[in-house]
């Protein structure tokens, strides 16, 4: 295949940007330019072509046109050939037409064989395999055959004075025939003059006869030479028509014919001189023999006149033949022009059809462009409206989302508040019950405290009386009896007195503690009342929240502030409970000591006074009171546990609020992502607009180029129609 051989030949060049595997890869023109730069660097430049945007066929067509113009310039300047690449269609090459690519490769190969670097090209061809060499040699021979008829010099003819005229082969044949006719006429005239001179000199001298015979022989020789020259010219014409490839032979034949013609012309000039001399001699001889030869001369004149008439007729015929030949030439020229016009007309018709199709497509595209512009304007307006709506919708969405979230959170909080209210109601009921029990216990404790105070007062009075009696008895005993009584009083009564004093102190402390506990119970009752008041306020706030949903945030703030206040109250109560625990521990320690003392007293002999028995009873009563106080403390602890559970519920609400805050942050992140996505979409829209504008600009530039080409084609058609012979005149001038 010729395509594979062309691919191998192209890949044989060095320093190519990339090797090819298919001829369609040459459609962008870069590899063509690199090859041409290696073949003829005078006419080509590596940086003259575009290397970006080659996916567009318009840019590829511009590159191919640039290469074709440089190749045509090489053919014109280096080889003197015109219109060697006019048949190549650059648009088809840009659209990857293999036939047009092969034509351009053949033109570049012909340029390579005629360039200065043809030796390197031949070496590259010889380095290939035999099949590709044979294919390339066949292509080279075909290219040279197409170049040689135009490069061979036209044949030349000579006029009577020996001037050289450049003519075509047909014109040379006509000129040779005309020259032959003229030579025949001259020879006939010469023969007539010689005959007349011989007739005039027959009687005068034999020398003149011999000279005339010699002249006739020379004329016959000249005729033979003319015939031989005609034969040579015919042979040369045949050789010119057949052998157009061999320039050297044609130039040699031309030189030979020019030498022969020049020699013939010189011989003709010498013969004319001789004839003039003989005519002068004959005139002198005629002057002597006028009378004798008048009759013969008249006859000869008659013959000459008849022959002159024949010659004039022949000249007329020759003129008519020349005129007809000129007409034939003009007709041939016109036929050639018409043929070229027909060929060009077909090509121009095809181009016109293509351009008409393109113009129709341009019109459709213009309509589409207008529609697209209108659509773009409408889309732009729609996008602007949508962007405004988006911005508004985003604000509305954020507001709606925030409102929904607030409503949902408020609903959840309402449900929780309802549950908390239920629990608070239950707690309130429990607290009310516990308050009732506490009040009852308080009343009982107050009654016990009053009884204890009364008993303590009575015991103090008894102790004082006993103490006075003891002092008096001690004083009496000290005055009456001696040391045994003192020893008894010292051993038994003093210890009892000290113990009783201690018991009195402890009882006083217990009484003080009881008063403190009463104060604490009063504080607890006050806090209970405050809690009941707060519960009522929460119920009122719940009713207000059901009636008014717009003040939810404020209510939440109030709830949070109330929760904080409740927390603080719980902390304070915990502190109070801790202090109460400490006091209870101290009282328990004191009770343990009293119990130990009671055990010691029970172990001693039962010689107790009625006062001691009363003290023991009082002590037992105090223990009972202590047990009652412990029961109250337990009830207070239960209340504190309930308050702690409420605190836990409030802490759960806080955790839920924290989760809500996290959800809100997540929603804010989603909103940010949506805004980022909207910004990306805007950027993509802007990029799409810019790309559409670029494509429209490219289309407009392509349409403008097509319009310019159409106008150039019209101008060329107009110029060719006005000057029919301009094409041949250009060729002849070249």
From Swiss-Prot:
Matching InterPro entries, A to Z? CH_dom, CH_dom_sf, Hook_C, HOOK_N
| Residue ranges of every copy of the Calponin-homology (CH) domain listed in the record | 1-113
Subcellular location(s) of the protein? Cytoplasm, Cytoskeleton
Q: Which GO terms describe its molecular function?
A: dynein light intermediate chain binding; microtubule binding
- Residue ranges that the Swiss-Prot or TrEMBL entry lists as coiled coil: 200-245, 291-700
The ranges of region (Disordered) come to 146-208
Gene Ontology biological-process entries: cytoplasmic microtubule organization; cytoskeleton-dependent intracellular transport
Biased composition, class Polar residues, residue ranges: 146-155
Quaternary structure, per UniProt, is: Homodimer. Interacts with microtubules.
Question: What function does the entry list?
Answer: Cytoskeletal linker protein involved in tethering membrane bound organelles to the cytoskeleton.
Which family is it part of? Belongs to the hook family.
Protein name (Swiss-Prot/TrEMBL): Protein hook homolog
